[in-house]
């Protein structure tokens, strides 16, 4: 497991190690969001997911989300790790840990983080079902790539 607070990795995520990165004496709450691979999506039985990303770009966007959270909730500490590669049903795909002095901010910041991940982080998934497969171009599932994963763009 990496010690980076914002990481993309191929190996299974060790949840406690993500949490440990936000432990702080001023924290009265640590909220942890754990996103897993579910079996049914839109009525189709999922066999597994294949996540791909441009790790350096994705980690920059995760860090950007961390900065946005810091601006909105100045006392928050955030760590986010997203897994790539083949993930089976029930595997952990993403872990978000947020610590704040009070629980309400922790919940809000955690929700903000997952929504922003789905909006701006360049991670794609290929859904494999019993009757086919499809690349999903963004995690909001508004863009698909029937010809395969998107080509790498220039880094910002």
Swiss-Prot record:
Keywords: Molybdenum cofactor biosynthesis, Transferase. Pfam families: MoaE. The keyword Transcription does not apply. Transmembrane segments: none annotated. Substrate binds at residues 36-38, 46, 102-103, 118, 125-127. Its EC number is 2.8.1.12. It catalyses: 2 [molybdopterin-synthase sulfur-carrier protein]-C-terminal-Gly-aminoethanethioate + cyclic pyranopterin phosphate + H2O = molybdopterin + 2 [molybdopterin-synthase sulfur-carrier protein]-C-terminal Gly-Gly + 2 H(+). GO terms for molecular function: molybdopterin synthase activity. One of its GO terms (biological process) is Mo-molybdopterin cofactor biosynthetic process. It comes from the Bacteria. Pathway: Cofactor biosynthesis; molybdopterin biosynthesis. It is an enzyme of class 2 (transferase). Belongs to the MoaE family. Converts molybdopterin precursor Z into molybdopterin. This requires the incorporation of two sulfur atoms into precursor Z to generate a dithiolene group. The sulfur is provided by MoaD. Heterotetramer of 2 MoaD subunits and 2 MoaE subunits. Also stable as homodimer. The enzyme changes between these two forms during catalysis. This is Molybdopterin synthase catalytic subunit. It comes from Halalkalibacterium halodurans (strain ATCC BAA-125 / DSM 18197 / FERM 7344 / JCM 9153 / C-125) (Bacillus halodurans). The gene is moaE.
């Amino acid at each position: 497991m990496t010690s980076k607070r914002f990481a993309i990795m191929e190996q299974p995520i060790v949840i406690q190690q993500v949490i440990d990165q936000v432990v702080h004496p001023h924290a009265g709450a640590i909220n942890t969001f754990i996103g897993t691979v579910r079996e049914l999506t839109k009525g189709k039985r999922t066999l597994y997911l294949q996540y791909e990303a441009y790790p350096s770009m994705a980690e920059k966007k995760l860090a950007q989300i961390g900065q946005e959270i810091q601006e909105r909730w100045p006392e928050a500490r955030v760590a986010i790790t997203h897994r790539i590669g083949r993930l089976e049903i029930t595997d952990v795909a993403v872990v978000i840990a947020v610590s704040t002095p009070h629980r309400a901010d922790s919940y809000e910041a955690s929700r903000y983080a997952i929504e922003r991940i789905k909006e701006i982080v360049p991670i794609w998934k290929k859904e494999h079902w019993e009757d086919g497969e499809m690349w999903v171009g963004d995690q909001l599932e508004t863009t698909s790539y029937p010809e395969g994963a998107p080509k790498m763009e220039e880094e910002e």
